[in-house]
């Protein structure tokens, strides 16, 4: 009986185990089916960044939008809400004639901001010369071998068809030269002009136009990011609006770039939270031009100094090789470091879980310079953390594979064998000379390694040329994100030639598209002086210093706009396209927009579209701009929210009540000062 009971028990356990396996398999099958059918619907409600390296970390997922603190940090800029974009022709505007004086073929050199600044100038020059414009050739793509043959030159970055349709009523435009002129260009038989930065209309009418009429074609080489002076005479004001139509409406990125930019924007707004776009402006060329090498250490200083020596040799820089970087920084001529920008943002009131998007291409010094910013803000991201490699590959197109990347490997160790004569004799050989020095292959690894071996910078490899073309697409994504950001701040707005840079174009586009969008234009000289006051204790700022920073940053929104009209516009019209490309509403004409020189009234149909928004602004002005839950004491300045649940939050509210009245008076005083200006 006992044996039969054991056998029965074993067989029963086997059946139970088998049943468990069947149920497990059935459960897995059901889960897979449910996942397959519900994948599309669930993706609409889930945070779209779960497959990326960035995991958003928030103190409180619920983000209150109707508080005074939100309006101060993220709300629209007051007093310029009546400023609206208007780049349409005013008065009589003639279409381009059927017969022109000839063809203008343009080759544009430089990076993203130089290309974008040059194209509107080229279109304006073509209309000025009554010429047919050939789609401009972008040197950064034509010289880069190995890029996708699907996109060439202008079409590698922008949408050709949209560009041609936008300017069809202004300039005749064709994709290529006629066959006979194309052959002459290949033989270098057409006249060519290397145009200087900011050339005057007089230059084109008296030097280029006669040659164009004689030869029916001219080639313009634009090497410096702009071929027409920024400020034109009053009788050529329509050419300024033509520039705006080209830059802000005609230059649309190609479909693949636009789609990825939209995806990045969607992934940047988890749970509908706002974000800051930050452009460090720290390029090697800009640092060398302005003499900021001593802000860095070791090899980075050598690289900057080498570039400055190269600029001096070619006449780009007129100063000395060795410059006191500390004096340059105090004079506001060097970029604000990411750590300093982080301190300013925290002092203004942005919390540790604020989303910050780092834009503007590569940051000189690498990710090491961004470590302090990551330490102050948890959600610091860029395009690499918001896109996948296959999405970037799709944007690049199908590219040829190159095997010219030769990895530096240690030299082979040759095993020396004794000669037969030494083996046969018993005589002790003479001491051998010391072996030759081991090649310092470890010193020349990396893109900077040539500094240790040579005074001459090596020529770019095929892969480096292709990467330069990719950088145009990377900055295109950054440009779209920066223009659409809730807040924008830059560490520097000058390039390696002293001209307005990527950040300047972004600020100009934001001013045109939405003048009330919050854009900080900090005075670097005043910021440097404030930072010097706490240089020895930067993370223990007191309430007085924080108040000074807030006043300075708040003034930079409007006063920086006024300063930009004097400083940046003289070099680049697109960095400040006001008042030529703006209008002011008829129902609410009184604002700081009139101080910017805007007197043209918008069409009547525009007033109805903005009336509701203006009511919201007025209601916001009636409330005190208090900093609720604002950690303004030095002890909590850079601290994350401590554990303690609601009790801690209540304590912060109680502690902040004493400061609310004082800060409310400060904000009211600033509003009065702003209205007086």
From Swiss-Prot:
Gene Ontology molecular-function annotations: glycosyltransferase activity
The membrane topology noted for this protein in its Swiss-Prot or TrEMBL record is: Single-pass type II membrane protein
One Pfam family recorded for the sequence: O-FucT
Q: Where is this region: Disordered?
A: 410-437, 619-677
Q: In which pathway does it act?
A: Glycan metabolism
Q: What class of enzyme is it?
A: transferase
Q: Does the keyword Transferase apply?
A: yes
Compartments it resides in = Membrane
Q: Where does the record say carbohydrate is attached?
A: 130, 542, 592, 651
- Compositional bias of kind Acidic residues: 622-631, 665-677
Keyword terms: Carbohydrate metabolism, Fucose metabolism, Glycoprotein, Glycosyltransferase, Membrane, Signal-anchor, Transferase, Transmembrane, Transmembrane helix
- Where mainly located? membrane
Q: Where is the composition biased (Low complexity)?
A: 644-658
Q: What's the superkingdom here? A: Eukaryota
**What stretches pass through the bilayer?**
15-35
Give the family from UniProt.
Answer: Belongs to the glycosyltransferase GT106 family.
Please give the name of this protein. O-fucosyltransferase 27
Q: Which organism is it from?
A: Arabidopsis thaliana
Its organism's taxonomic lineage begins at: Eukaryota, Viridiplantae, Streptophyta, Embryophyta, Tracheophyta
Which gene is transcribed and translated to give this protein? Answer: OFUT27
């Amino acid at each position: 009986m006992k044996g039969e009971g054991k056998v029965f028990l074993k067989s029963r356990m086997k059946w139970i185990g088998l049943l468990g396996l069947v149920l497990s398999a059935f459960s897995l099958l059901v889960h897979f089916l449910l996942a397959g059918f519900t994948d599309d619907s669930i993706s609409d409600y889930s945070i779209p960044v779960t497959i990326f390296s960035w995991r958003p970390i928030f103190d409180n997922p619920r983000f209150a939008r109707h508080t005074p603190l939100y309006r101060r940090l993220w709300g629209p800029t007051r007093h310029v809400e009546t400023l609206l974009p208007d780049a349409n022709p005013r008065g009589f505007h003639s279409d381009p004639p059927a017969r022109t004086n000839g063809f203008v073929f343009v080759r544009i050199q430089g990076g993203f901001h130089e290309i974008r600044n040059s194209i509107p100038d080229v279109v304006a020059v073509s209309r000025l010369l009554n010429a047919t414009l050939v789609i401009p050739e972008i040197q950064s793509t034509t010289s880069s071998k190995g890029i996708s043959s699907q996109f060439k030159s202008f079409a590698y970055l922008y949408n050709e068809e949209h560009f041609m349709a936008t300017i069809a009523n202004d300039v005749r435009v064709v994709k290529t030269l006629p066959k006979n002129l194309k052959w002459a260009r290949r033989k270098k038989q057409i006249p060519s002009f290397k145009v200087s930065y900011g050339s005057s209309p007089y230059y084109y009418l008296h030097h280029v136009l006669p040659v164009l009429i004689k030869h029916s074609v001219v080639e313009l080489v634009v090497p410096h990011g702009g071929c027409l002076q920024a400020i034109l005479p009053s009788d050529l004001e329509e050419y300024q609006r033509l520039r705006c139509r080209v830059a802000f409406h005609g230059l649309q990125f190609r479909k693949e770039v636009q789609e990825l930019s939209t995806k990045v924007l969607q992934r940047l707004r988890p749970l509908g939270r706002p974000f800051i776009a930050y452009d460090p402006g720290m390029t090697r060329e800009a640092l060398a031009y302005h003499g900021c090498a001593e802000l860095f250490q070791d090899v980075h200083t050598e690289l900057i100094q080498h570039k400055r020596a190269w600029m001096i040799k070619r006449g780009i820089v007129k100063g000395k090789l060795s410059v006191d970087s500390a004096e340059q920084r105090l004079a506001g001529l060097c970029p604000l470091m990411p750590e300093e920008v982080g301190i300013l943002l925290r002092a203004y009131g942005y919390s540790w879980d604020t989303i910050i998007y780092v834009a503007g291409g590569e940051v000189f010094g690498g990710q090491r310079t961004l470590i302090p910013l990551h330490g102050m803000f948890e959600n610091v991201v860029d395009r690499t953390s918001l896109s996948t490699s296959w999405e970037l590959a799709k944007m690049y197109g199908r590219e040829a594979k190159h095997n010219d990347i030769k990895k530096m490997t240690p030299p082979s160790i040759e095993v020396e064998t004794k000669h037969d004569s030494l083996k046969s004799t018993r005589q002790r050989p003479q001491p051998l000379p010391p072996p030759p020095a081991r090649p310092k292959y470890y010193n020349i690894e990396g893109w900077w390694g040539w500094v240790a071996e040579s005074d001459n910078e090596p020529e770019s490899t095929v892969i480096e040329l292709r990467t330069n073309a990719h950088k145009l697409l990377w900055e295109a994504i950054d440009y779209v994100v920066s223009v659409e950001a809730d807040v924008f701040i830059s560490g520097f707005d000058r390039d390696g030639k002293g001209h307005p840079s990527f950040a300047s174009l972004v600020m100009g586009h934001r001013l045109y598209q939405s003048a009330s969008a919050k854009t900080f234009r900090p005075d670097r000289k005043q910021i440097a002086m404030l930072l010097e006051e706490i240089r020895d204790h930067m993370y223990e700022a007191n309430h007085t210093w924080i108040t000074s920073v807030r006043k300075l940053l708040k003034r930079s929104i409007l006063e920086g706009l006024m300063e930009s009209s004097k400083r940046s516009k003289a070099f680049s019209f697109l960095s400040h396209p006001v008042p030529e490309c703006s209008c002011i509403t008829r129902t609410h004409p009184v604002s700081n927009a009139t101080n910017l020189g805007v007197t043209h009234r918008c069409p009547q149909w525009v007033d109805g579209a903005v009336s509701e928004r203006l009511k919201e602004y007025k209601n916001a002005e009636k409330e005190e701009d208090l900093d609720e839950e604002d950690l303004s004491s030095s002890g909590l300045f850079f601290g994350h929210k401590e554990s303690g649940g609601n009790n801690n939050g209540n304590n912060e509210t109680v502690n902040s009540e004493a400061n609310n009245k004082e800060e409310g008076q400060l904000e009211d005083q600033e509003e009065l000062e702003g209205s007086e200006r």
